[in-house]
Each structure stands twice: as C-alpha cells, then as structure tokens.
Amino acid sequence: MRFLNSIVLGLAAGSVLLAADPTFLRRRVPDIAPAACDLTANAKGSAYRPAFGIGDPDARQLKGIARYGELTVAPGGSSAMVSYPAEEQIYYTLDGNGILLYGDERVPVKKNDYMYLLPGVKHGMANESSQPVRLLVMGFKIPPGTEMAPTPKLMLANSDDVKLQPVEGHGPTSLFKLLMGTTASRRDKLAAASQMVSLFIMDFAPGGTNIPHHHEMEEEIYYVLRGRGDMVAGGGADGNEGRYPAREGDAFFIRLNATVGFYSGSQSGDHDLVLAVRSRFPFPRVRD
C-alpha cells in the first residue's frame, strides 16, 4: 500500500510539472504587490508592480515581451536611472505629472503622454509635483543581430492629440487611436519601434466590440483604461469564446494565435477604453 501511495504521489507531482502552458494571463494591476526591481533600486519614493514579464512568477510565458508593469513615483521622488542594451521600452502616463529623464534631457510629461525609449539610453522618471505620477512600463526584447533604425530624437506624443479612426476588420462599434508603430509605419502617430509593432487605444461604443480575432505572429497585452466589459481570451474548436469580466485596471496577456477581443459592458455614458500593445514573437531564425 505504501508503495502504491508513492506511485500516486509521484504521478500527481509529475502532472503538476507537466501542466500545459496557459493561453493567457490575467492580472488585476492595483492588487499586485510592489516588488523590488532595477527601476526602484536605491530610489526614493518609487514603487513598481510587475504585471507580466520580469518580476512576475509567470515571466517565462512571455517570449518577446520583457516586462509590463506599473511604476508610481511619489511627490519629490524619482525612479532609478536604467538602461537596457537589448530592450526597447515605452512609457504611458496614466495619471499625474512627472519629469522624464532621458539621457541628458529633462522632459515634462503629463497624463496620456507616451514615449519611445531607445535601447542603450539611460532613462527614468522624477516627480516634482504635489501628486503621484503613475505610468505603465513596457519593455520588448531586441533579438541578437537585429539592425536598429535609431530615432533622431526623443519621440513623445499625447493620446488626446491622436484622432479616432475605424480599422478594417474590427467593425463599426470600435474606433482606434493608432499611437505608435515601427519605424516603417505610415499610419501611426509615432513611427518609432523595432519589435513593438503597434500601440493603440480602442474606444468602444456602448455594447460594442472589436470583433474577436487572433494574431499569428505577435503577442499582445490589453489594459482596461476606463469602463468595464468582457475580455475574450482564447476559444475552442466549436467557435465559443472564452469571456472574462474585466474592469479598469485589469490587464491580459494573450499568446500568439489565441483568440483575443473585447465586448463593452457599458449601456450608455462614457465609452469603454482599452490600451493595447502588440509585439513580434521571436521565432528562431532560419539559417541558409
């Protein structure tokens, strides 16, 4: 009997070790405990909540995305200065006013400002205001051997200045603000990035949707900026969608080829807003 129990326990342990990788990850960002990281090392008044990637227990599930989390800098505080030789980053300011430290520059930033941060350039965030500044930090791995087209200067814009427009394939009830694309982009406000292919805001009419779909070459993260609804993450062979309640502050990471989308939960009033970012999956290079 003792021998049989040992076998059962061993099989149970093996099943845990061999658990299938998740199709998506879900995080309630305000509920994430702050964690120490390079952005907060020896820094005064800064806290980082790791949602996905570095600092999160499921970091290995992300292949091309290095990190995604929320940085808060208190009044009079500052983050550490950081630099990554093989990672491009985007900051998106959720609330408050701060000072972006970028190389030798000190650039004031406000709510809804977003910016592209080149690999190898030291950067951080300071706060000289009377209220906290809160921002999303997004990092994307640069594969070895990738040729970068450097941006001539700091690229920064505000999403309030980007027009809403329809995007083919996503229906009439969602409009898009195309914030940032690659250096080859001709449609985005900023053409800046290498591996990050699209940063955008979706504006949903009450009861609207962007029509669930999938991406064969990219990972994606949705972050609910305002409102509530149902997040679509994954689906079955019968066409049924995996739908999960989502509200402001919720974030979802979606693997490539998984069904992704959003259904607005609003019936009237303010439109629901979702900030989304897609980046290339680092497929192995084919050698000649």
Task: Give the label of every model feature segment.
Residues 19-67, 80, 132, 139, ...:
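A short, N-terminal "cap"/entry segment at the start of jelly-roll beta-barrel domains
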Residues 131-147, 253, 268-286:
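A short hydrophobic beta-strand segment most commonly corresponding to one strand
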Residues 9-20:
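Hydrophobic h-region of N-terminal signal peptides that target proteins for export
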Residues 97-99, 122, 132, 228-230, ...:
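Structural motif
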Residues 78, 82-111, 221-248:
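A short beta-strand-loop-beta hairpin characteristic of the jelly-roll/cupin
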Residues 1-8:
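Bacterial N-terminal signal peptides that target proteins for export
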